[in-house]
């Protein structure tokens, strides 16, 4: 009598053989992404999911790290945060289709704006669904530096947005709105921030990185359940030497970007990284390297990130994206995802602003 794991292995071998000829005919990642995912594959989880993903496609590699994946999936936002926030449907939208300007095949904000180290800074949201605040603060930091021509290198505080933009932005560590985070920066201002326990800033990140990370101080493990949202404090950390209200920086403009691939590229190339939200499936948590394309696993929630550039690999177009799961996840904290197909909604919820 076969046990459950053996049955799954037999099923994987059978289905891999069954679909082998079909997958051989897949010439591009776009064709692969357009194929319907079998119902049984949507239900796969854990090691069986990773095995299936690595058997079925050559575009990205998945790695089975169950504890890491469990923590990351547990800190995602609920699907509710996909919806446009009530009362905000009049947001300014920019980015008409590009027709007359030539765009390069590849672009990397880290290379163009080398005087802005924030672009290369990978944050760690810890065990809190704060990706919306982290992605917004990260993008704000980059744009502030870029638009000051490298003179202002202040990191915007994700904790200030997370704790004080409530209930306007959403529900703190349970998720929130990228767009409203930008509106908060425009209307109320945001103070300086930095890594957990960082000195010389108003509000460093509230939570320590979970577990051990290569080359980093060990702060301990994180609780099994997500952290409670920190309280909004109208003052800076002890010893900073500056009043909270005097430390604030204000955005001058906030806007969304139409989901035209070339329009998004043009805005990134001219003004810097953008904040984006997309739908996460379980296979994404096991991403190791390559160009991600959803292959199997259940829909698990929403996630917000920062798009810093784009490129092409073996004919496959991709976005280069900074995640907030520390530097030992993915490609040194980054991932690449299929570009130009609105894959997982990555091009459908993009917001940014100016300083």
Task: Say what each PLM segment does.
Residues 4, 8-9, 14-355:
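Catalytic-core signature of thiol
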